[in-house]
């Protein structure tokens, strides 16, 4: 009998005892009272003793599809097992998922009999907007009560460090409480809502205050990752992760929820508009609201991108004065960056700015993660890009030739540069086909932008831009980009952010974006 079978066995045993009592040998229970002390079963020690009470309500993971939500058990269930040693591999049995809450399931079903199918879908979309606000508010409050406050009280982090990581999160809660209150006020007793357009037009402009929070995310994520090297911080966060309230989401998932919610508003509003009849007065207001939120998202994207670019420029270390380049200083946008390896197995961190490619090595300087230049910066306009076929390069730099199949490596591309006596060639390897294609697209588009600005768009191929598979796959524009920003919520620890190449590129998704384990290689 294994440990997990014990509770069931104990229950059955007690039940059998209760059934056998009437069939006993006739000894009355008042004749021989038991003097044995009954010990209450011990409960498993939990993090609840360290964390202030938090309302255990459903948590919604906004970075996934709109219709998918997740929740956790709202009641603590006493554990009848004896206390056991805490394990990092332990999983909480109290955590469970449930389907999204629908409008038609929440309110009286009879109302469906007098509404058209299109109107029901409209009510569902409006309810999704309202429910999302409620979940967001609960998540933000949870982040403060379950993470910020305990770490401050236990001196796990300093107040200054926590302010840097959590940013202006507190100021966002009242904004969303205001919208939720207005949406509830206009909801009829039967649960239906007639108009939401005027409310949204009046409320959406306040989201401009998101710029400071989103612009701080790059620095916040970097500091949080650095603090995880502290055993106390890592231990606290791991215990939280394994506790029911976290829904198995780590701290950064909670801190990234506001950004994820921001980029979803255009999708939510378009869904409401799609099911709104043309003769409904709400249609004009919804169209105006969509224009407002798209403008706000675009502006915040730009500011966030500039903030990210400044952050990494400040952390570049130059071995010699000659490595400094005015193209780096003048850059306002970081198109993409991530860890790669060269063909000698050296880990590199590559930055693609607007007009220059910078290859670095990650180093620790004054207890901060910095990036030491590995080679001279390469101007994008003079860069030659080659998409290498799998097996064309092997470790050590040899070209395809006398080596066995098991020596072949995949996902390589090559960047080279020659200007007079100066020349460089780097064979770089991505961790998979997708990341390789992201790098190729990003570099191609960056070069096209630079050459187009110089009136040389027709010289792309003659400049050495070798066309490879997927050349036509460019980053989406306009509304499509806003939708795709929400789709890249992979939980990878990659630092590669390759979804932006211009000022309009979606910088929001890239704050927590993805290039961990990218493996490019270099051949000089």
From Swiss-Prot:
Residues 290-448 form the PH domain. Keywords: Cytoplasm, Guanine-nucleotide releasing factor, Phosphoprotein. GO terms for cellular component: cytoplasm. Coiled coil: none annotated. The keyword Iron does not apply. Transmembrane segments: none annotated. Residues 461-524 are annotated as: Disordered. Residues 472-484 have a biased composition (Basic and acidic residues). GO terms for biological process: intracellular signal transduction. It is found in: Cytoplasm. InterPro entries: DBL_dom_sf, DH_dom, Endocytic_GEF_Adapter, GDS_CDC24_CS, PH-like_dom_sf, PH_domain, PH_RhoGEF3_XPLN, SOS1_NGEF_PH. The modification Phosphoserine is found at residues 46, 69. One of its GO terms (molecular function) is guanyl-nucleotide exchange factor activity. SMART domains: PH (SM00233), RhoGEF (SM00325). The keyword Hydrolase does not apply. Residues 121-303 form the DH domain. Interacts with RHOA and RHOB. Acts as a guanine nucleotide exchange factor (GEF) for RhoA and RhoB GTPases. This is Rho guanine nucleotide exchange factor 3. It comes from Mus musculus. The gene is Arhgef3.
């Amino acid at each position: 009998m294994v440990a997990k079978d014990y509770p069931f066995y104990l229950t059955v045993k007690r039940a059998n005892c209760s059934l056998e009592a009437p069939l006993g040998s006739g000894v009355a229970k008042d004749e021989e009272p038991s003097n044995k002390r009954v010990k209450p079963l011990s409960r498993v020690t939990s993090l609840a003793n360290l964390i202030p009470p938090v309302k255990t309500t459903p948590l919604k993971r906004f970075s996934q599809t709109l219709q998918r939500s997740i929740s956790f058990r709202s009641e603590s269930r006493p554990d009848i097992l004896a206390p056991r040693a805490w394990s990092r591999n332990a999983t909480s049995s109290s955590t469970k998922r449930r389907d999204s809450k629908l409008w038609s399931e929440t309110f009286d079903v009879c109302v469906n009999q007098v509404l058209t199918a299109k109107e029901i879908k409209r009510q569902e979309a409006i309810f999704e907007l309202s429910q999302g606000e409620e979940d967001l508010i609960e998540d933000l409050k949870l982040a403060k009560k379950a993470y910020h406050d305990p770490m401050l009280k236990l001196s796990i982090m300093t107040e200054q460090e926590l302010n840097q990581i959590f940013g202006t999160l507190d100021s966002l809660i009242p904004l969303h409480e205001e919208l939720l209150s207005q949406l509830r006020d206009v909801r009829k007793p039967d649960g239906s809502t007639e108009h939401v357009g005027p409310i949204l037009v009046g409320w959406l402009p306040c989201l401009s205050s998101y710029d400071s929070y989103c612009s701080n995310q790059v620095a916040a994520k970097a500091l949080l990752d650095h603090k995880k090297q502290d055993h106390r911080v890592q231990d606290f966060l791991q215990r939280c992760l394994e506790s029911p309230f976290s829904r198995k989401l780590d701290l950064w998932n909670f801190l990234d929820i506001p950004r994820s919610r921001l980029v979803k508003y255009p999708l939510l509003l378009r869904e409401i508009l799609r099911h709104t009849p043309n003769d409904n007065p709400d249609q004009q207001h919804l169209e105006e609201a969509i224009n407002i939120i798209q403008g706000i998202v675009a502006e915040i994207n730009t500011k966030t991108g500039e903030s990210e670019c400044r952050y990494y420029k400040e952390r570049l270390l130059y071995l010699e004065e000659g490595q400094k380049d005015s193209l780096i200083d003048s850059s306002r946008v970081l198109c993409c960056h991530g860890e790669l390896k060269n063909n000698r197995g050296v880990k590199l961190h590559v930055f693609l700015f607007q007009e220059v490619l910078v290859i670095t090595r990650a180093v620790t300087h004054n207890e901060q993660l910095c990036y030491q230049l590995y080679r001279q910066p390469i101007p994008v306009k003079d860069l030659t890009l080659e998409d290498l076929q799998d097996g064309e390069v092997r470790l050590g730099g040899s070209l395809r030739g006398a080596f066995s199949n098991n020596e072949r490596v995949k996902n390589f591309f090559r960047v080279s540069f020659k200007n007079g006596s100066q020349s460089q060639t780097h064979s770089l390897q991505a961790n998979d086909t997708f990341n390789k294609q992201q790098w190729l697209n990003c570099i191609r588009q960056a070069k096209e932008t630079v050459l187009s600005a110089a009136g040389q768009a027709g010289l792309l191929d003659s400049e050495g831009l070798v066309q490879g598979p997927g050349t036509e796959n460019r980053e989406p524009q306009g509304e499509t980009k806003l939708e795709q920003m929400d789709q890249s919520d992979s939980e990878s620890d990659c630092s590669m952010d390759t979804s932006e190449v211009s000022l309009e590129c979606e910088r929001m998704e890239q704050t927590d974006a993805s290039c961990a384990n990218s493996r490019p290689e270099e051949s000089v």
